[in-house]
């Protein structure tokens, strides 16, 4: 975004460009001006922000993920509401989704596929041991970092095991 069109979200997050769009929110690359680091900001669509059911689901996503500190899970740093807009601030993961990688490269080498699967299993096992079930594991919610790491994202329809 140009300086003229620069958007500062919640007085702290300088939005740069859209990274993706899902069924209930849009994710943008931003800079956390307070901590001077890149972050991903997920903003609930305005049409859904008036529905308390969607807002509660969004809040549960933030809360579930924020309590899961694991190297294979995208970290959540912040969540809140600003002028009727609900948002989640997450770790920015530079890389591609597993879906994009499979589309671009086709089949993975079996060793790499096994590594990715083991990392996903580690993340989901950790979440499960901490009372959270993801419920939407798919290649589009698995991020592959530029250095070969794996991060599970989007706990949007996660639920507590006690639910």
Model-derived features with residue positions:
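Protein kinase glycine-rich loop
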Residues: 16-22, 27
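Activation-segment/catalytic-loop signature of the eukaryotic protein kinase fold
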Residues: 79
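Activation segment signature within eukaryotic-like protein kinase domains
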Residues: 116-117
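Conserved short submotifs of the Hanks-type protein kinase catalytic core
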Residues: 83-97, 101
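Protein kinase catalytic-loop region centered on the HRD/HxD motif
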Residues: 120-132
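Conserved N-lobe loop of protein kinases adjacent to the ATP-binding glycine-rich P-loop
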Residues: 31-38
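AlphaC helix of the eukaryotic protein kinase fold
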Residues: 45-67
């Amino acid at each position: 975004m140009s300086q003229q069109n620069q958007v500062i979200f919640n007085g702290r997050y300088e939005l740069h460009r859209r990274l993706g769009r899902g069924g209930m929110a849009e994710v943008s690359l931003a800079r956390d001006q307070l901590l001077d680091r890149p972050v991903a900001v997920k903003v609930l669509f305005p049409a859904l922000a008036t529905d308390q059911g969607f807002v509660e689901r969004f809040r549960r996503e933030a809360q579930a993920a924020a309590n899961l500190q694991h190297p294979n899970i995208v970290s959540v740093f912040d969540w809140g509401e600003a002028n009727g807009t609900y948002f989640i601030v997450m770790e920015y993961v530079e890389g591609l989704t597993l879906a994009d990688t499979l589309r671009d490269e086709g089949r993975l080498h079996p060793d790499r596929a096994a590594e990715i699967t083991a990392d996903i299993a580690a993340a989901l096992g950790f979440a499960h041991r901490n009372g959270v079930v993801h419920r939407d594991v798919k290649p589009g919610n698995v991020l592959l970092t530029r250095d070969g790491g794996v991060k599970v994202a989007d706990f949007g329809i996660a639920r507590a095991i006690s639910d």
